[in-house]
From Swiss-Prot:
Residues 20-73 form the F-box domain. This is F-box/FBD/LRR-repeat protein At3g52680. Keywords: Leucine-rich repeat, Repeat. Gene3D superfamilies: 1.20.1280.50, Ribonuclease Inhibitor (3.80.10.10). It comes from the Eukaryota. Residues 358-409 form the FBD domain. Pfam families: F-box, FBD, LRR_At5g56370. The keyword Repeat applies. It comes from Arabidopsis thaliana. LRR repeats lie at residues 74-100, 102-127, 152-179, 180-205, 225-252, 270-295, 318-344.
Amino acid sequence: MISPTMEQGESLRIRVVMGKDRISELPDGLLLKILSSLPTNIVVATSVLSKQWRSLWKLVPNLEFDSDDYESEHYTFSEIVCKSFLSHKAPVLESFRLKFVNFNPVDIGLWVGIAFSRHLRELVLDFYPAELGKGVTFTFPSSLCTCNTLETLKLVLCILVDIPSPVLMKSLRTLHLEFVRYKDESSVRNLLSGCPGLEELRLYRGDDSDIKVFTIEVPSLQRLTIHDNNDGPEFWGYVINAPFLKYLLIEELRCPEFCLNAPELVEANIAEVTSITIEKFLGSFTSVSRLLLNLSPLKITYPTGSMFYQLVSLEMYTREAEWWNLLTLMLENSPKLQVLKLTDRSQNFHKDGLVSGKWNEPKDVPECLLSQLETFVWRRFDWGREEEKEIATYILKNGRRLKKATFSTNPIESEELNKLKERRKVLNGLDGVVRASNSCQLVFKFDPSYLGSDSP
């Protein structure tokens, strides 16, 4: 029985014999770029095509191995990886990606060591044991944090970060930690403090109780992503000190505390924050110029006296109960706001009771409506709700600088005549509003994403 790689190569060779081999006429540099985008088992398979291809694959600067792709009666996965490294001749290894089900720590340490000796720039380790959830982990030790050329490190799933003492990866710019575990809080601090040039950090955490406080203190950090659904009682929250942070994305956060020092923050996208009640949470973002909020005002306390003096673009989701109360507060405290976008991400236009309460317009017209707001977009506008019609009317009546207002709604089947008539009546009503801005262009359209994607 021949290996899958040999079978793939034979198939390629047959196709080349039957037709003209035009690919081989391309320059070697271009061929290497093409091969670099393919998994290593496919790249190795091209070696049967000709003498040119036999030597060409050995110079591909990327090695990618997935143990699921290598099932052979002749060689183990470990032997295949070792043979590939022995044959590989590229002087600089741009990327080494390893996805494995079972492992021998000695083998992995050897492969990573060889990759480091070839000036490795990206390392991806993805361990998904056959018995996921049984506590089996691969320990990522401090001895692997020694590569001076490494620019990107990605650790995925059942990997235990165990770094008892400080390390140094002076060239590391990007670090992804996706559902890994941590020996203790010291391991987190030692890893992050050993990356003096780190610019991007992505954290994905599940329901674990490895640490009580996740501390991120990285002066060079510019981009931070957090997705954390850990709501265990042992986990307190985050302490982040990133004086040069420019971009923050929080996809999910269930911990009770969040302390952020990021005075240079420019853009923040905040969603699915469910347990934080501290008033200063929103106050951490007063320096931003662009802000996206998908929050429930019933779960987040607005910071008294906080002003968003730099905010020029605000996007809010409209599916949470009494979301308009948060909108009112943001309008009142964002005097330079120029762009306002409202989106119903749920695609459920009548929200089935998720939205409740009644909107009350501000006592005084917010400064941004009087002098700054130029663009107003409402995606998946729920024309059937009185509160949303009132909010839309209020903004049109008071937006003195408004240049364009766009409302998109869900498609309605042609046989639903009553709905078609009602929607036309509502949209005609908006069109008839006496707008504060004579130059405001009003646009109505259907939202095509309603039919397929749930993305905003």
